[in-house]
Each structure stands twice: as C-alpha cells, then as structure tokens.
Amino acid sequence: MEIELNRFTPAEQATFRLRALYEQAGYRKYRASRFEEYALYQEYQRFLPDAQVITFTDLDGKLRAIKPDVTLSIAKTAQPAAGECKRFYYNEEVCRPSRESHTFQTIHQMGLESMGAVDADEQAAVVRLALQSLAALNVPTVLEISHMGYLTGLLDALHVPAEARAKLLDFLRAKNAHELRTAALAAGLDESAAAALTGLLDLHGPLGATLTAARAACRCETQRAALEELQALQNALGEAGRGIRLDLSMADEMEYYNGLVFTGYVAGIPCAVLKGGRYDYLMQRFTPGANAIGFAIYLDELERLAAPLPPVQQQSREKSWLNIALPKGRLGDKAYKLLAGAGYSATEDYNDTRKLVVENPDACVRYFLVKPSDVAIYVEHGAADIGIVGKDILTESGADVYELLDTGMGKCRMCVAGPAGFTDDESRALRVATKFVNIARDHYERRGRDIDIVKLNGSIELAPILGLSDVIVDIVETGTTLKENDLTVIEEFMPISARFIANKASYKFKYAQLTELLNKMKEALAK
C-alpha cells in the first residue's frame, strides 16, 4: 500500500523522506535514551547550546538529566576503531530552555553523524546529504558554509587579545560593522587590523567568487589551509554544489565547531532549519584521533510551512516584497521620510490613515506601523524583513537579527541617574529602577555590583524621588526631565541611536532587494 505523503504535516513528510535518504546512504538509526547521567553534560558543558538542563535524582540515587543534545550521547558510545568511520542518523526530541518563554521546551530534531576516519570525501558526502535534505523539503532553500579556520586564523594573525574576542565575535554574528570597528580599535588594534575584521562582512556570496575574494584577503597559512579545504569541497561537490553560498563572517558556536560549518534556510521560515559542521575536538575527547561531522534539522520549524499566508501577502505572491517594520512616533516619521526620499514612499501617507499597513506596489515595499518595543520581535520572527529600532530596545530584547546600519537618528544615551550628591553605599544591594532590566543587570554584573531591580514601565524618574529606588537606569536625551526633578546623571554607559536590522532568513532570500534599499538609505543619510 502506497502512503500519500500529502496527508501528513511538512515535518512528518520530511521524516519519511529523510529516513529513506539516510538509510540509502548507509547510515544506521541511533536510538538515544531519554535520560543521561548529569555528569556527562556537566563535564562537556562548553559543547552544549545552553548550560541549563533539567535534572532529577533517579530511583538508583544517580543524578540524571533529560537530554538536551543527541550528538554527545552518540559520540560517547560510537568508539570507532582506527581507520573506521561509523555513520548514524537519529530522529529524537531534546529539551532546551527557550529564550522567549523562559521555560524549557522540547525540540524535534532529525540529523546524522559521521564519526571516526572523516576525510575530505566523507566531508563532501555529508555536505551533499545536507543539500539533499534541504531539497527533500520541496521548497526554495539556501545552504551557507564557512570555515572556522579562516576566522580563527585572522584573529591570531591580528593578535586580537583573548579577552576581546567574545565581543568582536558577537558583532560579527550580527553583521554589525559599525560597532565591530569601534570594539576592534578599543581592543588596541590599529585601523588596518580593524578594517581586516570588518572586511570579513564583505566575504559572502556565491562559493566560487567569494573564495577568490577571500584568497586576496589572507594573512596567514591557517586561512590559506581553510580556503584549500573549501576549494576541495567545491571540486568534490561539482554541479551539486552550485547553489552553495560562502559566508566567512559566520562565527556561531566556535567552542563546538573547529572546521567546516554550514547552515540551511528555507523560504518562509524566519530562522535556520539546518545546522552542522566539523566537531573534531569534542569527538577526540571520547575517541583520541577520531574526527566527526554531522548536522541536525529542526523539524518543528517546518510546521510553519503548513500555515496559510498572512492576508497582506496573499494578493502579492507573484512578486517578492520587502516588509518593513517602522516604530510609531518621531523615529518612525524620520525613518519613513528618509526611505520615501530614497524612492520607497507608500502610495498613501500613513500619518493620514488609520491603517497599520501601507504599501507601494511599484517599489514592492510594505510598511508595518508597530509599537517601538515590538519592532525587533516582528523582524526576528519574520513578519517583517527589515526594521528601524533603537539600540536600547534591540539590546534589551536580545533579538537574533542582523544589525546592518547605525542610522545616527534618535541619538541619546543610556545612563545611571540619581539624586544630586548621591553616594553609593556598597555595604548593601543597590536598588535600581528601570524598564531596561537586562541592560541594567548586564551593566552592574560587569562592575561586580550587587543590585535589586525594580521593574517599571514609565515615569522612571519618580522612583528615587519617592524612595522606591536609589538610582534609575534609563535613556537620556536632553536631561531636562532629570534637572526639573532634582536628579543628575551619575554615569553614561551606552550610546543609543536607531539601527537598521534585518531578519536572518530574509537576508539570504531577499539579499539583492535588501542591500539595494540599504545602500540608498546610506546615500540619503550622507546628504
């Protein structure tokens, strides 16, 4: 009896197709235990996506954990002999904390691992399977690759201090050129070295052309070796690898991956659905001399493909539109005027309508007018492709987006303020009133200061006046409100302005449209 796959959800269809694909390629199914001894995750914590796991004391008295990862379990038990390559695939659920809900959630993964004697041919075979896995989803996809050796080689060649690397890598991941350069100079690098780091952001595009550009930017043998490996991969894949894109600014999970890394995106899904790469360091902790490569597909994300298109998109399916989230208020007005001046005006003035969505069919742009604090959420979740948002809101939300431009609009600063003459009594916790809880906590953690946070949503200046707090953490533009209430700025610690942000998947699928708009916006700002 034939199974009609269209009766199943996208994730269920993918499971059938991928199982057949992996078994045909010689992979054996691995069945993981639901629980592992907590000691495993404690010892290899730096290889986990998050240090938080659910633990419990089992009936035998041992401390166990609900598994947050499958690869660790496979690596522990695989034990390939010298010269042997073991191949496994899995279809499992893992349990990890959610940044948004602040609760644990189950994540359905399907993936494969190749462990042991992993040579160039084996590596190419795994990447080919990643391409075939994406193709099995029957929707437009993109596979991006990179090599950790190119990035670490550059950091070493530039003598980047170890204590500065984490911050620089954060800016690289966000494609945040303006703050990457500033941080590089602050770390003691000269202009040439800072330019080399920001130049990584330009090394993305079709595999062949980007390899050529990357060779010209090489500074050490480690980088050249990484590019030779990527060239060998391109040669091995041949026609199958034509659609692969290279992005040498990828800096995800550098504690885990040590060589080739790759990420897969699906049209209509706002985040990566496939992640993988080489993780030799982890494998060698269990089996000395062994190497490993693998990837996982996040099946839960595929369920989005079954959802109907939003009403605003159902009438424009034949064209690719840019969906832009603008904040209501003065900043949104400034941003709209700038975009309108660059040729992206709407057919109707959004200030003269009660509509929340206005369009320009000729320019294929659509504006959403949203609460300022929600802009980053709309962009991160793919409801908008791009948006304009204040750095304060972007930092507080921790949204996983690309930060492509500092527009310079809406300049102000994040400050600690309090009554004139305030003296901090370090013998007790400092009471801090703010609506920027994460920013305040991070600021004082860096200083090693114990604080109690009072979260408020408005009229923050009232808190120290009424004795609710000792100080406040808030944005300050002119300082007039502070002065009128006998408060003064104690410390300025973060400059704020409006940032141009993009959804990561939209950046892959709408790159030409997005960069054209971005470049026109830069030209308008320069006038």
At which residue positions do the language-model features occur?
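Short active-site oxyanion
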Residues: 62-64, 138-142, 269-271, 288-293, ...
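Long, charged alpha-helical interface segments
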Residues: 151-242, 477, 488, 510-527
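A generic structural motif
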Residues: 60-62, 114-120, 506
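Beta-rich nucleic-acid/ligand-interaction surfaces
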Residues: 32-51, 146-156, 250-259, 461-466
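TRNA-binding/sensing appendages of the translation machinery
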Residues: 1-67, 124, 128
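Domain-level signature for soluble enzymes in the chorismate/prephenate branch of the shikimate pathway
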Residues: 317-527
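Glycine-rich, N-terminal phosphate-binding loop and its surrounding beta-alpha-beta segment
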Residues: 52-101, 375, 380-389
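Positively charged, Gly/Ser-enriched RNA/tRNA-binding surfaces
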Residues: 7-25, 36-37, 71-82, 89-140, ...
